[in-house]
Amino acid sequence: MSRAIIENAGEHRVSILINGMYPIDNINDVKMAYRDLLTDEDMFIFSAVAPTAYRHIENHGRSKAAQAARDIAIANIAPDIVYVISFFEGHSDSYTVSIPADNVPWKTVCVCHDLIPLLNKERYLGDPNFREFYMNKLAEFERADAIFAISQSAAQEVIEYTDIASDRVLNISSAVGEEFAVIDYSAERIQSLKDKYSLPDEFILSLAMIEPRKNIEALIHAYSLLPAELQQRYPMVLAYKVQPEQLERILRLAESYGLSRSQLIFTGFLTDDDLIALYNLCKLFVFPSLHEGFGLPPLEAMRCGAATLGSNITSLPEVIGWEDAMFNPHDVQDIRRVMEKALTDEAFYRELKAHALAQSAKFSWANTAHLAIEGFTRLLQSSQETDAGQAESVTASRLQMMQKIDALSEVDRLGLAWAVARNSFKRHTRKLLVDISVLAHDDAKTGIQRVSRSILSELLKSGVPGYEVSAVYYTPGECYRYANQYLSSHFPGEFGADEPVLFSKDDVLIATDLTAHLFPELVTQIDSMRAAGAFACFVVHDILPLRRPEWSIEGIQRDFPIWLSCLAEHADRLICVSASVAEDVKAWIAENRHWVKPNPLQTVSNFHLGADLDASVPSTGMPDNAQALLAAMAAAPSFIMVGTMEPRKGHAQTLAAFEELWREGKDYNLFIVGKQGWNVDSLCEKLRHHPQLNKKLFWLQNISDEFLAELYARSRALIFASQGEGFGLPLIEAAQKKLPVIIRDIPVFKEIAQEHAWYFSGEAPSDIAKAVEEWLALYEQNAHPRSENINWLTWKQSAEFLLKNLPIIAPAAKQ
């Protein structure tokens, strides 16, 4: 119904309000159901403190407070109408709806599905707690400005059994989805269903839950009265989900009527696809309910072309629409009579089939939506305009209401303070928060941390229209805090203390650091911010520890599967540093669906990193021997490698290649720029004692970005021999300096450099030695690939590229 209203709303703006106390999976499901119709801007989540289920008396204070918190959220959305699709909920869970008793600047319209508990108090209101809950809700229900009933029968119940005047009640009817339709199934599909549910070739079908008003006992009794040949030809298939004790009771009842247990087939739970198939395949659908608000199963069956019989009371005559197809559900002989006629009178059966399609075509969600929108319009036309400023008075009154609730603990009150702040959408300025959890604690000056520094710097410098840009960090066992002390020490201006972060609607967290060590603990924080309407986005630099675990230390091997599975299940967006990484992430998630349940709202995309060292908040300073190093570089063709030394980086193979070249008498220099990393102890020991060290071999650790830029400018070429990268910043930095590149032919390098690099393959030293010689020959002829033709971005452009991948809401155009 709600989707149809949105689809047919025309010039009217429609928003949805989601209960933030529900599990994040439920919130995901709701967003998923509307994401093709509504923008994130029109999806609101209200916060409150759970649990609020009325069945537990200790929750009553929180329940009242949650209603007040919801009112504050609504006041900040400032709608003309609040449309409550299901009102009598919240006894067993934290579902929260209410109709204010005081004057508020919106109208409330409630859907009435039925008043079955009110009309059957002995059966449904025997529990004093539930009776109190239901009658309280009914008193609230009567305050609604309008009631939209799903049938004329339900509308009449409202008029007759409540204090709601008839001019406030409108029948908008109901409908079923387009998936319920006549379908021509293949023989293979039919046989599969028969095998799955032990179905005969022909059968009578009924569908319901096991409860007295569904009248299954009368149906079984009536079926037992059919002639034996009809029973034998048409077993009864009951699409009921039953508990073992219920099943045994029903089977004993059937035996008491002379039926064998094999004549009743219980399907158990049915998927929608299988239910639709059974509607299509059944000989007859029978629905003997004693009371319905509408009666969806008969309409579903008729939409699927099934010959359909049903009760002649409450709403079912409106749905079935033909007296001859109905029976008195209290009279088993009448049920038997109509069933037997349908199974033996061919002309009547054909009429039932034809009527099913003609009658079901009268119901559609579009018709229901149009009736609802007409009702909204009439309600507003008959109402006085409200003062939008009343939103502030609603907030003030609800805060006073919360203060007077004695049953709230101090923890409850603290949670409600945060909830009220989150629900105050009008006062909220959207925030773009850069997660620098690693950088804020320890800037190890790795490539990833250079990315974090650069992106943060550009976002702070350029700003994002409509958003406050800041940095945050997470400390295990605590919460997210603003990284204001870090900002104060690295950027001009005063930023204040490291206060806790209050995530609110449309805020965006973008984690540029690698925070695998914080998972799975960080999941609670992510779910909490998303339940407040914020977005959690993470940059993925690579997943090499998952693809090649031997390249990583044990801790990373342990953390990475947890990290990526948590991101797949809980993050809104994964933004990879290259298309190659994005494809790898998608593939890994697909390969691991047996244990990873990805967030259905999640998108995986990519951007490219920047390269301008000047904009990456570069370190400065020249080493004492800078001039000697630069002179050595100028004295012979010099090749440079840049990056932390790790097994995958190819340093050992490259060193061995140059040793071959030196043995051949080649006067080439190799400059290795990078500190010692993991599992390269023997290689580093070899470097420290190498006979060519500081002659033709130079190992530079912890140099400044300023000096690195000098080395790029004076080298003959960059050698990038890595066997795996997410992006490869040195490649882009070299291109920016117009430094030619000799690189391994891995997918990400081909994505970035394309034909503008000299590629090699193989893991033997001779493969690199050969590539160097071939490249030099081309270089001497001025025919080598030109790295300056590689497309690269400044950090400003990279930050802009990143923003396009984030759920940033553009500022509204000025009128």
Swiss-Prot record:
Task: Give one GO term, molecular function aspect.
Answer: glycosyltransferase activity
A biological process (GO) annotation for this entry? O antigen biosynthetic process
Q: Where is this region: Alpha-(1->2)-mannosyltransferase?
A: 1-374
CDD domains linked to this entry: GT4_MtfB-like (cd03809)
Q: Which UniProt keywords apply?
A: Cell inner membrane, Cell membrane, Glycosyltransferase, Membrane, Transferase
Provide the E.C. number(s) assigned to this enzyme: 2.4.1.371
Q: Which GO terms describe its cellular component?
A: plasma membrane
Task: Kindly indicate whether the keyword Membrane belongs to this entry.
Answer: yes
* Pathway as given in its UniProt record: Bacterial outer membrane biogenesis; LPS O-antigen biosynthesis
Topology within the bilayer: Peripheral membrane protein
Phenotypic consequence of gene deletion: Elimination of the C-terminal half by transposon insertion or gene deletion causes synthesis of an altered structural O-polysaccharide consisting only of alpha-1,2-linked mannose.
Catalytic activity from the UniProt record: [alpha-D-Man-(1->3)-alpha-D-Man-(1->3)-alpha-D-Man-(1->2)-alpha-D-Man-(1->2)](n)-alpha-D-Man-(1->3)-alpha-D-Man-(1->3)-alpha-D-Man-(1->3)-alpha-D-GlcNAc-di-trans,octa-cis-undecaprenyl diphosphate + 2 GDP-alpha-D-mannose = alpha-D-Man-(1->2)-alpha-D-Man-(1->2)-[alpha-D-Man-(1->3)-alpha-D-Man-(1->3)-alpha-D-Man-(1->2)-alpha-D-Man-(1->2)](n)-alpha-D-Man-(1->3)-alpha-D-Man-(1->3)-alpha-D-Man-(1->3)-alpha-D-GlcNAc-di-trans,octa-cis-undecaprenyl diphosphate + 2 GDP + 2 H(+); alpha-D-Man-(1->2)-alpha-D-Man-(1->2)-[alpha-D-Man-(1->3)-alpha-D-Man-(1->3)-alpha-D-Man-(1->2)-alpha-D-Man-(1->2)](n)-alpha-D-Man-(1->3)-alpha-D-Man-(1->3)-alpha-D-Man-(1->3)-alpha-D-GlcNAc-di-trans,octa-cis-undecaprenyl diphosphate + 2 GDP-alpha-D-mannose = [alpha-D-Man-(1->3)-alpha-D-Man-(1->3)-alpha-D-Man-(1->2)-alpha-D-Man-(1->2)](n+1)-alpha-D-Man-(1->3)-alpha-D-Man-(1->3)-alpha-D-Man-(1->3)-alpha-D-GlcNAc-di-trans,octa-cis-undecaprenyl diphosphate + 2 GDP + 2 H(+)
**Record localization:** Cell inner membrane
Please explain the role this protein plays, according to its UniProt record.
Answer: Mannosyltransferase involved in the biosynthesis of the repeat unit of the lipopolysaccharide (LPS) O-antigen region. Catalyzes the polymerization of a tetrasaccharide repeat unit containing two alpha-(1->3)- and two alpha-(1->2)-linked mannopyranose residues.
The domain section of the record reads: Composed of two domains of similar size, connected by an alpha-helix chain. Both N- and C-terminal domains are required for the synthesis of the complete E.coli O9a polysaccharide.
The record's misc note reads:
This enzyme is specific for the E.coli serotype O9a O-antigen.
Please give the subunit comment from the record.
Answer: Monomer. Interacts with the C-terminal region of WbdD.
- What is this protein's record name? Serotype-specific mannosyltransferase WbdA
Organism source for this protein? Escherichia coli
